[in-house]
Amino acid sequence: TEMFGIKYPIICGAMMWLCKPPLCAAVSNAGGMGNLTAGNYTTEEEFRGAIRETRRLTDKPFMVNITLLPSIRLTPDHYRMYFKVCAEERVSGIEFSGTPVDKAAGMAAIEGLKKAGVRLFHKVGSVRHAVHAEKVGYDGIYAAGIEEGGHPLNDDVTSMVLVPRIAES
């Protein structure tokens, strides 16, 4: 809440096909953190338009989710485009899920986004991934257990187990 000046410590989960400008803005307007799913957009014009539409619907902060997984229809060119647009539009934050950005796109991508003032978060499903995210320099992590849905890990660790393990590490 302090980092973004939002009223409630609630971040809208990134949901493909659902987290578009109306839902993102509604969550932000209600005091939480809206989350625009980049994967809904395959061109720069569509993606930039969605960010700008969200800004027309709310004057509150919101973030963008970028899922870096080889199993979805997006390519490294899409990821580079998302990074570029997020930096140019100076979105409040990005929630990354899947492959860590430093491994998928290199540290230059992280440095460019941070230089633009974008806060970076990584959604993690294991202690190992949380430790890696901290070492890389993300601004924060989300611990996402198996109940989160759409999880790429094969273990059955819930958030109630994962959060204390990460806090202890």
Tell what function each PLM region has.
Residues 1-169:
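Active-site entrance/lid segments in N-terminal catalytic domains of soluble metabolic enzymes
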